[in-house]
Amino acid sequence: MEPPRGPPVSGAEPSRAVGTVKVYLPNKQRTVVTVREGMSVYDSLDKALKVRGLNQDCCVVYRLIKGRKTVTAWDTAIAPLDGEELIVEVLEDVPLTMHNFVRKTFFSLAFCDFCLKFLFHGFRCQTCGYKFHQHCSSKVPTVCVDMSTNRRQFYHSIQDLSGGSRQQEAPSNLSVNELLTPQGPSPFTQQRDQEHFSFPAPANPPLQRIRSTSTPNVHMVSTTAPMDSSLMQFTAQSFSTDAAGRGGDGAPRGSPSPASVSSGRKSPHSKLPSEQRERKSLADEKKKVKNLGYRDSGYYWEVPPSEVQLLKRIGTGSFGTVFRGRWHGDVAVKVLKVAQPTAEQAQAFKNEMQVLRKTRHVNILLFMGFMTRPGFAIITQWCEGSSLYHHLHVADTRFDMVQLIDVARQTAQGMDYLHAKNIIHRDLKSNNIFLHEGLTVKIGDFGLATVKTRWSGAQPLEQPSGSVLWMAAEVIRMQDPNPYSFQSDVYAYGVVLYELMTGSLPYSHIGSRDQIIFMVGRGYLSPDLSKIFSNCPKAMRRLLTDCLKFQREERPLFPQILATIELLQRSLPKIERSASEPSLHRTQADELPACLLSAARLVP
């Protein structure tokens, strides 16, 4: 029997605390929750269950009245239960085990599942695959859920649930558009869907772990993800029925059948069916491990919209609107202009986020997370300074040549880092370069090929995107399927250098945008180098000319650009402090020779 799910739909805010309720939890644990008016049992026990790796969907709650247990619905109001005792038990059909931890040295690249830091010496559960540092052991869920025995049946049987009353709750039945657009009968259902984590469907049968101490088990399902109790019940029943009908083919001889395992808790040292499998080659195992991810890493970087507060609209660009927001401090939130994203766009966007989340550089805006509901949005650090465009063309800030060259060096350094990560900016311009806390350069709005590409249904269109003044000729012509390259970023960087060395924008004498596009694309128009400052070094002038070459093969790449600017900086004349000792604060006695002072002391 499964208890009713979900709290009552109510728009009222929870009021003050009125009492407490004592709750007995699985694994002989207990807690005390605060009773608040307007809250349900579901809401009150939500945090206590999640920190223990449990979920309301796989548990049932009872009221303890005169020593007898009475089933209670999760949507029952908590206020009338003030002073009573509740008991939470795990559903019988949910296969739970205790952790089986072993000490392990990870010779291959591994990261802790909790602090996400590099892991070399640590511990690993041989049942569910959790790996962690010793100091992270307090964060490990107490209960271990082993889905390896019925995961294959889960995917084959998921289609049979399409006619059930809870079809909309099956993870595999949710389309991407439903995930991206909030919809549902109640606000609470919408809030729960934001935290829902669906199991990734594998292309091949799941690879069971071969008992070894050389590689971690990266394809086990985590216990912290919410699980649907009806799916687990259906899976366990169908698996046990199928195994009995095949007469033992479903499990190796000498090992406990999945049906017997699902009816109770396994021993920590019980053997898995995978132990009887023949060892496969290391190469084949690595291929399968790549196909079967243990957990989508984007799960840790997607931010629920309810946690982000938009404060002020900063501006609107070619690909979205930037807001100042609050999320654990001041952040910049860029809401991207993607109306009704398709499944292909959603997957491409998430793939890009996996690349951007690994960017860490002093000259790059820090990527902090992303959102997919109700639309695409990116969260980055908040930069207090203004953009380079504002300094040069609005505020008319005066920089000396040494400062201009240093800004150019930092910009080249940040772009060199992005290109080393195989990230093409596609929209480098002075508006996307910020001067943070003085003259520290921060490059923003990088990557985002999914958003910066025009789409027609599921296929990208071959149309130029970006700002015209910083657009290379090959990007304007769009003769190649993908004209964006490292060299197209170099051209845009050349235009930024032109702004630094002239203090003005190129083509300011031409008012027609279409005329600029036509003439630059044909090679008839290029920035006027006669406007460069007279004190600009010759090496910088040559570099500027090379970056603005019409043929992209003739443009240098950022490692060469950075080396040129660093060499130029070292060759600039500097006013160095004298190595001699200053004599500004000497007393008159200090100027006397030492021999005279010693002679004076000898006089009686």
Curated annotation (Swiss-Prot):
Compositional bias, Low complexity, is annotated for: 252-265
> What cofactor does this chain's UniProt record say it requires?
Zn(2+)
One cellular component term (GO) for this entry is:
mitochondrion
Q: What modifications does the entry list under PTM / processing?
A: Dephosphorylation by the SHOC2-MRAS-PP1c (SMP) complex consisting of SHOC2, GTP-bound M-Ras/MRAS and the catalytic subunit of protein phosphatase 1 (PPP1CA, PPP1CB or PPP1CC); this relieves inactivation and stimulates kinase activity.
Instruction: Quote the biased-composition stretches of kind Basic and acidic residues, using this chain's numbering.
Output: 272-287
Protein name per UniProt: Serine/threonine-protein kinase A-Raf
Q: Which GO terms describe its molecular function?
A: ATP binding; MAP kinase kinase kinase activity; protein serine kinase activity; zinc ion binding
Q: Which domain of life is it from?
A: Eukaryota
Residues in RBD domain copies: 19-91
